[in-house]
């Protein structure tokens, strides 16, 4: 039985609001801590998570608590903060043994285990080197006037979302993202549905 502790900020059972898996039921496991410092910008383009606090749990305790939240949900999403700072094969194998498929939402600054089933890489506004070799989806948030970066990794899907702080419809940003997609048809528009319908 593993005694390593993982610091967890929160967990909840909800619907994935963005990306190619939007609309599907998932257990969310949010890890504390991040290796980037993203400052607030005028377009709401900052870190949307209070990730510094949390409690420590073992891998066995994490699995047990997730199954209390849902006994039948097949997917768990590892998010943060930056989950790659804490996760290891011991935790991933515990999740696999419990029957979970594993998705991760990462900034891409750390290499990832092959045990992860779905990689959603979302580089932040500050430029940083990506250490993941490839991703199932590469997601960027864009505000009005921001161009599309040239992807430095291979992905199955390339997605852009209009910057949205959840308080008002981001009409200008949305129209800009629509323009970007039309000009770059290999990209797809991805709305942050959970913010529009105000769910977690």
Q: Can you name each region flagged by the protein language model?
A:
Residues 6-13, 25-26, 36, 40-116:
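Conserved Radical SAM active-site core
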Residues 30, 80, 122:
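Small/polar loops that bind or transfer phosphate-bearing groups
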Residues 33, 51, 142-144:
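Non-catalytic surface loops within mature trypsin-like serine protease
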Residues 84-200:
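Conserved AdoMet/S-adenosylmethionine-binding subsite of the radical SAM
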Residues 1-46, 183, 188, 197-199:
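Flexible, acidic/Gly-rich N-terminal and inter-domain linker regions that tether
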